[in-house]
Design a protein with these regions (language model features):
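Exported/periplasmic ABC-transporter solute-binding proteins
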Residues: 26-63, 67-74, 79-105, 111-259
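Bacterial N-terminal signal peptides
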Residues: 7-21
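N-terminal secretory signal peptides that target proteins for export/translocation
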Residues: 1-6
């Protein structure tokens, strides 16, 4: 039975009040970077109800996801910045023809909620705000493309880690956002989707166009997935234009802007 037919059957059973457990139901192992974490949690229950499949998420910094997959960990779906999907594809880890561009997200400047928000409307204003900060945090440049971009800007501006200005590379999902929320760090630079819903953190603004570095996310099915059709269905499900508002409310731009 094809996926469309299965979805019709599942819908019919649901209307009749019957339990939905398709014979072909599986648990999809979805490995993702931290940026889409809040977004992906929104459609997952509907996908599970509609298809009968279960979704098990693993969220981590993107560099760690790549290393785990290259080391042989098994997954069905991967959602990562497009360049990392490229690398996995070149390594033979991606099922041919299964990748799909999803959306993109930009880098935001964030401070503790209630603290004065610095002007970040121009490159000069951003540099001034960072120069005045006593402490800065941003994503790990060894683990994420966004972190590498910020580290490059700081180096270009000769903003270094000193006793007077501490710089702490730490991913938002591994405690970086909490450093800002707790007041331990003055200012942070993270992908908007990683900090938008974090309690105690306020967005001062996006990096201006001359400094911005958008991260395009893509999804793909792993070459050794035992459930390639349900895996592909999950990617289509989260990439459907009807989900665009879910992506936007969690910090991403519209799906069409990632094309």
């Amino acid at each position: 039975m094809g996926i469309p037919s299965m979805r019709i059957l599942v819908a019919a059973l649901t209307l009749l009040g019957l339990s939905v457990t398709p014979l072909s139901a599986t648990e999809l192992r979805v490995y993702s970077g931290g940026a889409p974490q809040e977004t992906l949690k929104l459609p997952a229950p509907e996908f599970e109800k509609t298809t009968g499949h279960r979704v098990a998420f693993t969220f981590a910094v993107v560099g760690a996801i790549r290393q785990r997959l290259e080391a042989g960990e098994k997954a069905d779906v991967v959602l990562l910045p497009a360049p990392l999907i490229d690398a996995l594809e070149q390594a033979g880890k991606i099922r041919p023809g299964s990748r799909s561009r999803l959306t993109r997200v930009g880098i935001a400047v964030v401070v503790r909620a209630g603290a004065p928000k610095p002007d970040v409307s121009t490159p000069e204003a951003v540099r001034a705000a960072l120069m005045q900060a006593r402490s800065i945090t941003h994503a790990d440049p060894q683990a994420t493309p966004g972190g590498r971009h910020i580290a490059g800007l700081l180096k270009q501006w000769d903003i270094t880690d000193t006793p007077q200005r501490r710089i702490t590379p730490k991913s938002a999902i591994s405690g970086g956002a909490e450093l800002i929320a707790n007041g331990e760090v003055d200012i942070g630079l993270y992908l908007l989707s990683e900090v938008l819903t974090v309690k105690g953190v306020a967005v001062a603004g996006m990096l201006p166009p001359a400094l911005q570095n958008y991260i395009v996310y893509a999804g793909a099915v792993l070459a050794d997935s035992p459930a390639p059709e349900p895996a592909a269905e999950f990617i289509r499900f989260v990439a459907d234009p009807s989900r665009e508002q879910q992506w936007k409310t969690t910090g991403f731009e519209s799906i069409s802007q990632a094309k």
